[in-house]
Regions:
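Charge-lined substrate channels and their catalytic hotspots, especially those that engage the 3′ end
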Residues: 2-295, 302-348, 380, 384, ...
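Electropositive polyanion-binding surfaces
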Residues: 41, 192, 197-199, 225, ...
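A short macromolecule-binding patch
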Residues: 105-110, 171-177, 655-672
Length: 715
């Protein structure tokens, strides 16, 4: 038996395999010294050729500075610079990578060397010896911190065990669930499962069900699954709702006495028709000929939500309301956001207000920030306010027309100062009571929307200037700002190169205003063109992301030196922070600890991005559901993405996006040209480029993966 084993090892042990086994051995025992004899024994090398091969590899490893010869014939890991910490990134194609904390070169991690690391895990790796003409490669030796241990999927229940089948492409294997950890889950249920262990020798992680969402395919189940997938809550904690129920809605005598009274000033709200949480209202009155007082009144949420209480802690954790296609997941309990704080018509409400004195040229002659009590006279939808603007008729027509005139002046001033006018089309769905999408339509931003937008921007900027704008010899107090950095020059160059194919160009150097004006010219030029949505999307990607920070750098996209978020405390936690600090500082209070508020700003920025991703996932789900009932139908579209695995096409009629897989382009073998965003056929030289118009047929709709497959229609 021994001879057979020896012969088998001698035949099958390749140099690459022996190298990896030696590397693994030295990394597993980095402080031990080995002789050749000990190495041969550890690796079960029993033939002379294998031992000689081992000696040759050891010599190479010394030359590569991977090993050191501590005394003649005894070797030890040369650990100088070879152990690194960073983030593991798992790819669905197996090309996993490691990004070092020090920002160095990305390192390839083969699947066999990943040690069950999952996407975005914080890990420690050992760097392999550098091989000629090979990219750096390493092995995960320790998982320091899991990025995520909870996954959403569909249960497949067998007699004695179950698996969670997940469409998460960055989880290499399905999750094994012992029968006693199913929590009543049945075959076909959507569930949330937590990984509890992953033994080194096991192919699958072991998990336990922590929540059953319902039957796969049901609307509420799928919407909750999207929330769970992004780590967002889909139920409100009972103790937080109980705390909200105890908050009195009545306004106290002290509040009446301490606040500026606007109850007899014409005041109204303008919101989407399906809105329930009205957190802003406008008031207007003529002070004297040519001078108007305009009030921007914001729900005084922090009067009711005390800092450090259970409601506040939950709001801080959530940081934002989440708007899925068919529902809102509020940051605050419903009693607060839809009842006590909501500026509903004909009800006395507490507000935090910015009051402007404005002349007919749209110039702010004076402003003040005060706590108020208001009473809204009318609740307008955007459509109702728009009708007043267009016809000049309707309730409060003089007030709305005056506000609209002022808003247009404010907007013109902003754009002249270099603000960028992104006006994206928003996809909306008409859905029935079961959540089924009946039609797709585009939400337009009209004058009524822009009226509200301009006064909210003005209030936000005024609040930021009040705290941030201080004399040069003074230091501004700590405050959360909404900041937006200048575009990256390389991204602008790439954008310019891309739009050249459509006959457009932008400035990539010069002053901030010159660059932003050239971008605005581009956005004007593409209006109502077939490439509009594509060019707008690529232009947006060239911009930096706006975020929250206590370190003010201004807001490039709005062309403001000072900007914050003050106007939506019902749905954004940063606005609650701003309200509290503004109240403190207006009363003469001292500054606060910067580190604490910077951390809250970072968390809020992160949660804002997660919420946006969840919202997009819900739109994508409904698009796939909608198109799934239109299999075989033909649509016109535009190529919105070109990859090595196929073409992405966005449909003109409804902005639904799907893919024409490379395998379905069967008339030729196509080469992917990454630089020029195109596929080119080898034999017939047919070319598919980004922005090309195409006609497709809906071939497949996979709700589980939120994917649409299209087939190209040749014309």
């Amino acid at each position: 038996m021994a001879k057979k084993k020896e012969k088998k090892a001698g035949k099958r042990m390749k140099k690459s395999e022996m190298s990896e086994r030696l590397i693994s051995l030295f990394h597993t025992k980095p402080n031990e010294t080995f002789s050749l004899k000990q190495l041969s024994s550890s690796l079960n090398l029993t033939t002379h050729p294998l031992k000689m091969l081992c000696a040759d590899i050891i010599t190479e490893m010394i030359e590569d500075d991977f090993l050191q010869e501590v005394e003649k014939g005894h070797y030890k890991l040369n650990d100088h610079g070879l152990i690194m910490t960073g983030v593991f990134q798992r790819k669905s194609n197996g090309k996993n990578s490691f990004i070092p904390d020090d920002g160095g070169e990305t390192i390839f991690i083969a699947e066999r060397n990943s040690a069950h690391a999952m996407n975005n895990d914080k890990v420690k790796i050992a760097l392999f010896a550098k091989r000629k003409n090979r990219n750096p490669e390493g092995e995960v030796i320790e998982i320091l911190e899991r990025a995520n241990d909870t996954f959403v999927g569909t249960l497949k229940v067998e007699k004695f065990y179950a698996f969670l089948l997940t469409e998460n492409r960055t989880l290499a294997n399905d999750i094994f669930i012992p029968k006693d950890k199913l929590k009543g889950g049945k075959n076909g249920d959507k569930a949330v499962v937590k990984i509890v262990e992953w033994p080194e020798e096991a192919k699958n992680p072991i998990g336990q069900v922590i929540d059953i969402l319902g039957k796969a395919g049901e609307n509420t189940t799928e919407m909750h699954a999207i929330l769970a997938e992004f780590g967002l809550p889909y139920v409100y904690p009972k103790n937080v709702e109980t705390a909200a129920e105890k908050i009195p809605a009545e306004i106290s005598e002290a509040d009446y006495a301490e606040r500026e009274d606007f109850r007899n000033v014409t005041t109204f709200t303008i919101d989407p028709k399906d809105a329930k949480d009205f957190d802003d209202a406008l008031s207007i009155r003529l002070i004297k000929p040519g001078l108007w007082e305009v009030g921007v009144h914001i729900a005084d949420v922090t009067h009711y939500v005390k800092e450090g209480g259970v409601i506040d802690k939950e709001a801080e954790k959530r940081a934002t309301s989440v708007y899925l296609v068919d529902r809102t997941i509020p940051m605050l309990p419903e009693r607060l956001c839809n009842f006590i704080c909501s500026l509903r018509p004909d009800e006395e409400k507490l507000a935090f207000s910015v009051i402007f004195n404005m002349n007919e040229k749209g110039e702010v002659k004076d402003s003040r920030i005060v706590h108020t009590i208001i009473k809204s006279d009318r609740r307008f939808t955007y459509e109702e306010a728009q009708k007043v603007i267009e016809t000049g008729e309707g309730d409060y027509k003089e007030e709305i027309l005056e506000l609209n005139k002022q808003a247009q002046i404010l907007r013109k001033q902003r754009l002249a100062a270099g603000a960028i006018d992104f006006d994206r089309v928003e996809v909306k769905f008409e859905i029935d009571e079961t959540g089924k999408p009946l039609s797709v339509y585009f939400k337009e931003s009209k004058e009524a929307n822009k009226l509200i937008e301009e006064f909210m921007l003005l209030a936000n900027r005024t609040v930021a200037e009040k705290i941030g704008k201080v004399p040069k010899n003074k230091k501004a107090k700590v405050f959360p700002y909404r900041i937006h950095d200048l575009p990256d020059p390389d991204k602008l160059e790439n954008l310019n190169w891309f739009i050249n194919r459509f006959g457009y160009k932008i400035r990539t150097s010069g002053s901030k205003t010159e660059i932003s004006k050239s971008i605005n010219r581009l956005l004007d030029d593409i209006k109502n063109k077939k490439e509009q949505n594509l060019v707008e999307t690529v232009s947006l990607r060239a911009m930096q992301k706006a975020r929250y920070s206590t370190h003010n750098i201004g807001h490039y996209g709005l062309a403001f030196d000072y900007y914050t978020h003050f106007t939506s405390p019902i749905r954004r936690f940063p606005d609650m922070m701003v309200h509290r600090l503004l109240t403190r500082y207006l009363a003469g209070g001292r500054t606060v600890q910067e580190a604490k508020y910077e951390e809250l700003c970072d968390h809020s920025s992160e949660m804002e991005q997660i919420a946006a991703n969840a919202e997009r996932a819900s739109v994508k789900y409904k698009q796939v559901e909608f198109m799934g009932e239109r299999l075989g139908m033909e649509f016109d579209g535009v190529i919105s993405g070109v990859t090595e695995w196929g073409l992405y096409v966005e449909l003109n009629e409804n902005k639904c996006e799907g893919m024409i897989p490379m395998r379905d382009l069967g008339d030729d073998y196509y080469d992917f040209d990454e630089k020029n965003y195109c596929l080119t056929g080898r034999r017939h030289h047919k070319k598919f480029s980004l922005g090309d118009p195409v006609t497709i047929k809906v071939a497949r709709a996979n709700l589980e993966k939120k994917q649409l497959d299209f087939a190209l229609i040749e014309k």
